Amino acid sequence: MMGSATMTPGKAITTVDNTAMTLSIPDCQGAMYTSQGAVYAGSGYTGLSGLVLSEPGDDYDHWVNQATISFPTAAKAEAFMDTSLSKWKNCAGKTVTVTNKGKTYRWTFHEVDGSPPEISVLDVQEGANGWECQRAMAVANNIIIDINACGYQITDQGHRIADKIVAKVDNED
């Protein structure tokens, strides 16, 4: 799906990411990254399970962060999706400066695609030779599917990964 036969699972994700970072537009953090503590704070989520995948080593051409976040009810998950959509739309067309772990990056957001139960947005890193990410978020029952698919030729990979996870959640009913 990502165009790489050598991607392997890496770090399992079991909690929200509380990495200290600064964004020039703080409300774009959820449109930029998956499973962020600042984004999920106060949402009522009850659990998180995720995984990071890439080629081996630190010099990879493909990177995916995928997470499922559970809520006590479908209504709470849907409310989180609606809030996320509103924030993501406010990031569209804007460039955000991110300072993370002592490094500064600039990302430009494209327009948000889709509407609940699934949304996505493409963001492109400036000065990174075409490195871009598709953020995708979907809701299925009481679960938020939170995806970030990055590489040099990203089209709809985040969306397709989200669809596969939604199908699994829907089959568990």
Annotate each predicted stretch with a short phrase.
Residues 1-50:
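N-terminal "mature-domain start" segment
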Residues 12-23, 86-132, 172:
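Short Gly/Thr-rich strand-loop-strand
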Residues 27-31, 90-92, 132-134, 149-151:
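Sequence contexts marking disulfide-bonded cysteines in secreted/extracellular proteins
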Residues 48-56, 132-140:
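Short, surface-exposed beta-strand/loop micro-motifs that present aromatic residues
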Residues 49-82:
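A short acidic-to-branched-hydrophobic micro-motif
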Residues 62-65, 129-135:
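Short, surface-exposed coil-to-beta transition loops
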Residues 64-67, 138-151:
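Short, well-ordered beta-strand elements
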Residues 148-173:
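Surface-exposed amphipathic alpha-helical segments
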